[in-house]
Amino acid sequence: FLKDLKLYESDEKIPLLKDLLVEISGKIPLVIEIKKHKNIGILENKLVDLLENYKGKYLICSFEKNILFWFKKNKPNLKRGLIFESNPKKFEKYNKTLFLYKYYKSRADFISLDYKLLDSSIYDFCVKNSLDLITWTIRNKENFEKVKEKVDAVIFESLFKL
């Protein structure tokens, strides 16, 4: 099913992960995000099997603490990251509480933080606790300039001239 879908406004098809792994052949590190789903363990086991012989570097990340905890329990040497974004305006006051809950439940190795939270107490917590930080999603040079000294890595949505 997925292999027949086309990328938005193009003739390019969405590659399967197994094909992508062969294509890049370890040339670049991968950040693999696992979206929320039911039956935690089934998809994760399939992913572990798929990555077993992959020679390149990769990280697993998710918004979901239970997915990350599954990897902590079943693949403890695999680096796992908690993705966190700000809550809607009326719930912003709960950001740090929710973050701390997810962080301590997931036992994440690094944090992938929405760039809008880089001036928050969540960012301060990460720095104080020497957590590796990735930020997302940077779409222009101005935002890149603001964040580049604060984080260990940046996720871009589109390319722009640095």
Predicted regions and their residues:
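Metal-dependent phosphodiesterase/phospholipase catalytic core, i.e.
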Residues: 1-88, 106-109, 113-116
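C-terminal active-site rim and adjoining tail of enzyme catalytic domains
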Residues: 12, 83-85, 90-162
